[in-house]
Amino acid sequence: MDSPPKLTGETLIVHHIPLVHCQVPDRQCCGGAGGGGGGTRANPFCPPELGLTQPDHDLGQADSLLYPSLHSAPGAPTGSSDSVKSRSRDGRGPGAPKRHNPFLVQEGVGETGLGDLHDSSTGDSVTQQSFHLHSASQPFHLSSFQLPPSGPGQGRPWGATHSRPGVVEGQEQDPATALGTQCSTSHCCRPELEAERMELDECGGHGGSGSGGGTSDISGFSFEQEWKISSDESPRHPGRSGSGTQHCHCSSTSSQSEAADQSMGYVSDSSCNSSDGVLVTFSTLYNKMHSSSRANLNSVPQSCSDSSFCSHADPGAFYLDLQPSPAESRMSCESHHPENGDREEGCGCPHVSSPELDANCNAYHPHSEPCPAVADLTACFQSQARLVVATQNYYKLVTCDLSSQSSPSPAGSSITSCSEEHTKISPPPGPCPDPDPNQPSEYYLFQKPDIQPEEQEAVGSPAEAATAMGPTVLEGQVYTNTSPPNLNTGRQRSRSYDRSLERSPPVRLGSLERMLSCPVRLSEGPAALAGPASPPRRVTSFAELAKGRKKAAGSGSPPLRASVGDSSQEFSPIQEAQQDRAAPLDEGTRCSHSLPSLPLGPSLDLLGPEPWSTPVCQGSQSSEMPLPSLRAAGQGPLAQLMDPGPAFSGSPATSHTQRDSRARADGGGTESRPVLRYSKEQRPTTLPIQPFVFQHHFPKQLAKARALHSLSQLYSLSGCSRAQQPAPLVISTAQGPAPAPSGEPQPFTSQASGRGARNAGPEPETSRPSPLGSYSPVRSAGPFGSSTDSSASTSCSPPPEQGTAADSVSPWSHTCPPTVRPATSQQPPKEDQKIPTLAEYRLHGTGSLPPLGSWRSGFTRAESLVRGGGEGSMANRPNNANHLSPQALKWREYRRKNPLGPPGLSGSLDRRPPEARLARRNPIFEFPGSFGTTSHLNCRLNGQISKPLSLTCPDLQDPFSLTEKPPAEFCLSPDGNSEAISIDILQKKGLVKAVNTAVDLIVAHFGTSRDPGVKAKLGNSSVSPNVGHLVLKYLCPAVQAVLEDGLKAFVLDVIIGQRKNMPWSVVEASTQLGPSTKVLHGLYNKVSQFPELTSHTMRFNAFILGLLNIRSLEFWFNHLYNHEDIIQTHYQPWGFLRAAHTVCPGLFEELLLLLQPLALLPFSLDLLFQHRLLQSGRQQRQHKELLRVSQDLLLSAHSTLQLARSRGQEGPGDMDRVAPGERVKGVGASEGGEEDEEDAEEVAVVAGSSDHGKWARGGQAGWWYQLMQSSQVYIDGTAEGSRFPRSSSSSSGSGSEKKKGVGSGGPSQAPPPPPREGVVEGAEACPAPEEALGQERGWPFWMGSPPDSVLAELRRSREREGPVAPPTENEEGTAEPSPGGIKWGHLFGSRKSQREARPTNRLPSDWLSLDKSVFQLVAQTMGARREPEPRENLQESHPPAVPSKPPCEVQALCHHLATGPGQLSFHKGDILRVLGPARGDWLRCSRGPDTGLVPLAYVTLPPTPSSPPGSSQN
């Protein structure tokens, strides 16, 4: 903190807030930090333990109370600002206890005043674990409070913004830098700016006094106070503590572009350096301030001070105004701090009422904000929101040589020092230090008037916002991202941030949800946050930044705005921020623009009217009122909910006058302003979720994306257009004060009136799509999702309920924690007043918010969607898409479009827990006064601040989900949801998802190698058939499903009348010869000429293969899409391709995006691939069939022979019993294959015929057996494993055939038979015996050893079999075959009897190859049992064994006289004992004592198996 001296000029802390951070939540945090209500919230930049001590908290509350007066008097005397500033420097107010330095590691160490902090920043910094930049003493707070008029961050919970949970440290740093630059630009100047700056300070002072008020003097940061507050808030709202100060700075610092960067970079910690500047998290800031020169915000700003840094922040960063003089910074901190104190006392939202922060994070006093309590509440809520985003908040420190200006905010400015995690826990507001009254509240890059338009035009530029809205109501919006992606920064951040805060555990919503949380409504925190932060714009100069912002917001802005649009719903604050930027013109306006401050919670409450309510509450419109409520909610989502009054201090009923003051400062015109946040076109095109990617390049990408009109952007644009009609206010807001009047402008205009020029100025920024918008729940009337949409809807034709109550409340709910909403309910009158505005605001800013609950309950989700919320959301989302990576973009767009279904459905589809919770909470927070508005706001605020709250509100299920789903719907059918046709968006999304899956698989197939040569081979279906299989199995069906969706059954043909319609008909129609279809036509002709392609489906698939070869699949789809005549002719209105022109253009864009990668792959597919595949398949089947038939014949013959043989051998009883079973099995196996065999085996097991079956049923053995059996499915590859289970069941199961199991098992197992090709594994005879043995001796390697019980059972079965088998196996070789004859062995001829090895391995081909008849084979097998040659001695030696093998006997079929030497003569019916096979067709047999050769054809198996072995007659 000792680096403040380093700041020769103003240090702008640019708060880069990921989409989430861009939202008001940061400010909320700030408010939370500042507000007593925020006590529970953890300091986003420092752990709760770093939070303020109770004294600090009290002081903060007192300050907050004092600050409300300042807040009400944005143009507070410079003198008071100076006094405050000096106090800030001193770090001690008259009675201000020292605040813990939020940047300090130790909690309570930072009790010293800012001055002390500064003086002992190095030493005390460590002691000041809490980033208490300001003295804890209330007087100090008061001073700080006074200062806010001078300081941009005077009352705004900018710290909250600073510490947006969604923003990464680096991001935060960037925003800090940007803020610094911005502040330096705007700091000098006007009282109004000063007031705005005060507001910033308020944000910072309250929530992040250190960040804002203390910014000027690093050692005298208001951080101490801020952090104290943060610490106090921290318990309640982890993200709120220290958010007050930070709010100011964070919000101001983070521009939307910056936010996008932060979103991308939030991943990295404080060390993250953005191209434009150093991204510093609160922790980093703290460390630097204490130990390193850069530790100070001032020092950091110095290092990062450069226009580029600011410009970088412009997209997603807020520029914190760092006052040059520590005293000033302290004063500003104190001025913030008093507000913080008030907030702490009054729900930590009094801060809301404190000076609002302009887009540049400069706090300006909302002219009509008398309610410090509101600010406190807002701060609390914001703190919570920021808690979520805090971890992702990065602060850019920019040092501007505005020494004449109030000293730059101390390093303590929350933006700079907020760490993402800390921010999330208790985002210390990064209020711009309240400069001395003489010092300008804000630094304007441009003259205040210029900045106003710029800000209005481009909320994206925090600097612009700050400049334009300098003293105006930038508090809620301070964090508003200037870059369209930063929509998240503004509103998004507040909502999602608040929601995140409520979920503060997920400090870093690196996840999409978190991004939505911030950028989207509070409930949608992650999505919203992600959007704005992701694509931070990097502009070298503020002017450039502002221009870029303007472009993003006003013109090409829709993509950017779309991103912001996401925010937009959540980003009403953005609009407010823009308004805030316009603050120089009209604080009220600014307040409106500050809608993002909603996430600020307290800032929203106090500044909420400015940032959130500002549009809703700040102006005379009810919108402003809700904003404070929202802000309160944002600041202390839960805590605020606990004290709705403080939460909604903005409302007259609320005790927090700051919020009211802020609303009043907004001129009470917040109502008109709330919805004006941004026009559809200005909504962020990029997807709010992207920010989590933290690709700082996205800002540039974003610009490119806008230029390119990425699919998502296009989608968002269409959605915006539709939304725009419903929400002209939003559009105007985005465009600027002038645009605001365009439709939605009216509500905002009212706000503008209330806020004055400020509203107009910042409105464009608000209009600019905020990350929130895209991701905010679309199903809520689209205020967020389709902020423009909602706005327009509200302004133009929002359903009264939804438009006013729902929309108004929704944005706040999204942005602010539930507390704010309760505040809203507290001030039903105000809400009523601002409800119209709020509804408008919600429509355009919280359009998707309406789905949140309360008002949602009042209005159907569809209604909300119809209002344009959905569309707005969608539009916003597409904008955010620009920030997304191509894949993310693709998915975002897909999601946006997919939500095309009913609003409710859409919400459900994309439902994110946060939003759902918010929706549920909505009812919880519904209050009699403004059930819709307040409830919704509360829900939203809480949702963003804390996901639990969002969970509570079913309608606010998830900002992202709501935004995603409804936007597609809304965008597609902004004019009343073409849903009249009842289009199933989910089903449409499923079609696109199928294509996505196919493309992913194909791309993965090619991704196996990077070598072009290898890739070419991978794409060649003849070399790598897999690619062809993937295309045929996945891509072709997916594409066909798309083309078949909604396909008419018949098409009218001039000649034949009705003609059946099918995808191929569409191909025909779309490939008619034309200037651009020569290639397609040629392909069509080629495919049509293949006679092999016999069906339309085959032709269609071949056509797809050809399109892949010529890399024209995407082109063909686009061509088809462009020919609406073809589509109308062939498709129903609800068909995918028809709906792509109406309800879900985004889905089609997503489809095209998904198909794009295929144009880059080297396909060389055979158009007849499918035909050849089918042909080969047929051939294989035929071959198998033939094989099976021949096998069956052989098996049947052999089984018959062997059955008789085995019967004869085993004896009537045993043989009969076993042989039939075996034979049946064998036949079954041969015919039915493995299944039959297994079935037979199972039967055997069940019958208990097999020991295996018995023990398999037993406990231990049972489980092992089951495991063994079930495992074979996975180990089919292993012959042993698969055979084992089967054989065990068949062998042991054939257990009845004990002999085979045991006797043959042994020999056959020795040489495991190789699996046979033609036979099913189970059909192999060998395996069975092997199995028996295998069980005992070797189980499959994968199985481990069988249980002892199994082994014992096996032994017993063997012993049992042994007795039987031994007789049969006098020679194992011969006996085995006959007993089990191995069940398969006997079927196939020779089992083990021939040779152990051979029988085991014997394949059908083996014996088929033997050129012998079946009988010959049978005889051979029988004889082979005695492998020994038919030697007589062997025969004689065998005779003893012969009886044991009855099967070796044959019966003479006729009389035969030996005609040659060695032949045997016999009579018909004689029983001959087979001694073995002889040559050719002869058997060596014995008849009594005589032996000789017998023609095989003359003998057959004895009819009676029981015939005695030796009964052969001579």
Swiss-Prot record:
InterPro entries in alphabetical order: Run_dom, Run_dom_sf, RUN_RUSC2, RUSC1_2, SH3-like_dom_sf, SH3_domain
Cellular component annotations (GO), alphabetically ordered: cytosol; plasma membrane
Positions of region (Disordered): 67-184, 201-220, 228-254, 402-444, 476-510, 547-603, 642-683, 732-832, 1204-1255, 1279-1405, 1423-1446
Record field: compositional bias (Gly residues): 205-215
Biased composition (Pro residues): 426-438
Biased composition (Polar residues): 122-147, 478-491, 565-577
Coiled coil start-end: none
Domain RUN intervals: 1026-1170
Biased composition annotated in UniProt, kind: Acidic residues: 1232-1242
Comp. bias regions, Low complexity: 245-254, 403-418, 592-603, 786-796, 1280-1295, 1321-1332
Cellular location(s): Cytoplasm, Cytosol; Cell membrane
Keyword field contains Cytoplasm: yes
Alphabetized UniProt keyword annotations: Cell membrane, Cytoplasm, Membrane, Phosphoprotein, SH3 domain
Positions of post-translational Phosphoserine modification: S534, S541, S557, S651, S776, S1378
Description of how the protein assembles with itself and partners: Associated component of the adapter-like complex 4 (AP-4). Interacts with active RAB1A and RAB1B, and with GOLGA2. Interacts (via RUN domain) with RAB35 (GTP-bound form); the interaction recruits RUSC2 to the plasma membrane.
UniProt function note: Associates with the adapter-like complex 4 (AP-4) and may therefore play a role in vesicular trafficking of proteins at the trans-Golgi network.
Record's comment describing the protein's domains: The RUN domain is required for the interaction with RAB1A and RAB1B.
Protein name: AP-4 complex accessory subunit RUSC2
Organism of origin: Mus musculus (Mouse)
Gene behind this protein: Rusc2
